[in-house]
């Protein structure tokens, strides 16, 4: 009698090096591991050669229209690939494309969802309120998904609190994901070249590093920096790029904030 192989496929359109650790971990527990993505950027860890990479369209965030088009095309590709190629696989949906997990309501695969960004809540950042028909339909679909899913994973207790409106607390697991690597070595402040370059030797640094898009509530740092202008020992750093960055820079300049610095993404 043949033994049924354990198979799993991850769905993540814009897979970065953080997903490599997930894939490598699944390789220790599953016979077949695949990922539907536009491509994978490897970090200090190499991806296990056992992983099968199945390409879908690349996520394009150059404009709202391109973002919606590539999300929609990616979602359609995911549906058909799961239907015809991965019928007997467990599925892990990441929230890119955010609509890809809708496929789970049409398929019989066991599945889990990893919530990096919370939709439809994130739509409010672009002016779509919770009373809008799109928002209400999305919310209804999400509740059905949560009822059917084996588990939901998210990044923090705060995000879990938001997700409780869609499903039971027992299903929602908090996993503060990040890439683990023995190659990441702490550098003492006195010898840190970044500290020296930006004159942070005698500062307490409050830093945000990542995307600065409409769905990222980083404007609170501007408000905190405004309230701490007289504390010369504190320096705020906002590192990254995104649609909201220009507005935040203008806001900081309008308030004449000397205690916050904006920097591009760092290597």
Where are these regions (language model features)?
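N-terminal subdomain of nucleotide-sugar transferases
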Residues: 1-51, 228-230
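Conserved donor-binding/catalytic core segment of Leloir-type glycosyltransferases
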Residues: 179, 199-216, 222-225, 237
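Nucleotide-activated donor-binding/catalytic signature segment of Leloir-type glycosyltransferases, i.e.
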Residues: 240, 246-267
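A short helix/loop element that forms part of the nucleotide-sugar donor recognition site in Leloir-type
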Residues: 185-199
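Membrane-proximal helix-turn-helix segments that form the acceptor-binding/catalytic region
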Residues: 83-86, 101-102, 106, 119, ...
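Donor nucleotide-sugar binding/catalytic pocket of nucleotide-sugar-dependent glycosyltransferases
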Residues: 37, 54, 135-189, 261-263
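Acceptor-binding helix/loop patch of EC 2.4 sugar-transfer enzymes
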Residues: 60-66, 112-143, 182
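An aromatic- and histidine-rich active-site surface loop
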Residues: 17-20, 71-78, 83, 89-109, ...
